[in-house]
Amino acid sequence: MQHNLKTIFVISHSTLTIILFTELVTGIIGNGFMALVHCMDWLRRKKISLVNQILTALAISRIFQLCLLFISLVISFSYPDLTTTSLIKVTCNLWIIVNHFNIWLATCLGIFYFLKISNFSNSLFLYLKWRVEKVVLVTLLVSLVLLTLNSLLINLEINICINEYQRNITYSFNSYYHANCHRQMLSLHIIFLSVPFVLSLSTFLLLIFSLGTHHKKMQQHVQGRRDASTMAHFKALQTVIAFLLLYSIFILSVLVQIWKYELLKKNLFILFCQVAYVAFPSFHSYILILGDMKMRQACLSVLWWQKFRKNYVEPLDL
C-alpha cells in the first residue's frame, strides 16, 4: 500500500513538474513572440500606438517574471542550500516589481478597451474617453505609489523575519522562511492584487452594460446582423473574460496557500499552486495573440514558414 502511494506521489510530482516547466517555456516563447512582432512593427512604421505600447511592455514584464520564476525554481529544487537571506530578499523585491507591472499593464489594457469601445453618454466617461492616453498614464503612476508601499511593507516583513532567524539559527533560512514568514508575504500580496482585480472586474461589468445598451438601440434600427461596434464589444469581452478567468485562478492559487498553509510543507501542493499561478502570465499571452489580427497573421506566417522549411530541407538531406 505504501509502495503504491509512493509511486503515485512520484508520478504526480513528475507530471506537475513537467507541466510547470512547460508552462514557463511556452509562456516565455509566447510573450517573446508578442514583443518581437510589436517591436518589428515599431521599427518599420517609426511609430507605435498606445495599445501596442501596453502589449509590448506587458510581454517584456512577463518574460522577466517567467525567467525569474524559472531560475528560482531551479535553485529551489536543485540547490536549496544556496537560498540565503540575501538571495530571498533580492528575489522577493524583483518578484514584486515584475509581478506589479504584469498585473497593472494587463489592467491598463482592460481600461483601454473599455474606454475605446464602450458607448456611454455620461460627461465624465466622454471626458475620459477622449483622454485615454492620460488615463492609462495616471493609472500607471498611481500604481507606482502602491508598488512603493508594497515594497516597503514586504522589506519590513523580510527584515523582521531575518532578525528573528538570526536570534536562533537552528536550520537553513529557506526552511525558516517558508515555515514562519511566507504566509505573511502571501497575505500582503493578495491585498495589493485585489486593487487591479476590482478595477478589471468593474471594466468588465461596464462593458457588458454598454453592450446591452448598444444592442437594444441596434434592435430598433437593424435586424438580423451585427454592426462593427457590437463585434468590437464581443471581441473585447472575450479578451477580458479570458483575462479575468486566468486572473481569478492566479488569485485563488495565492488564497489557497494562505488558507491551507500547513499544506505548503508538502512539495506536491506547492507544485500544484505554482502550476495554477504560472497559468496567468503564460496563457494570457496566447489569448492576446489569437485576439489580435496582426499577431495572429504573424503567427500563421511563422507556422507556414516552418512547414515550408521542413518540406524544403528534408529532400536535401536525402
From Swiss-Prot:
It is a multi-pass membrane protein. It comes from the Eukaryota. SUPFAM superfamilies: Family A G protein-coupled receptor-like. Glycans are attached at N168. GO terms for molecular function: bitter taste receptor activity; G protein-coupled receptor activity. Residues 1-16, 75-93, 156-189, 260-268 are extracellular. Its main location: membrane. The chain crosses the membrane at residues 17-37, 54-74, 94-114, 135-155, 190-210, 239-259, 269-289. It is found in: Membrane. Keywords: G-protein coupled receptor, Glycoprotein, Membrane, Receptor, Sensory transduction, Taste, Transducer, Transmembrane, Transmembrane helix. Signal peptide: none annotated. One of its GO terms (cellular component) is membrane. Residues 38-53, 115-134, 211-238, 290-318 are cytoplasmic. One of its GO terms (biological process) is detection of chemical stimulus involved in sensory perception of bitter taste. Putative taste receptor which may play a role in the perception of bitterness. Belongs to the G-protein coupled receptor T2R family. Several bitter taste receptors are expressed in a single taste receptor cell. This is Taste receptor type 2 member 117.
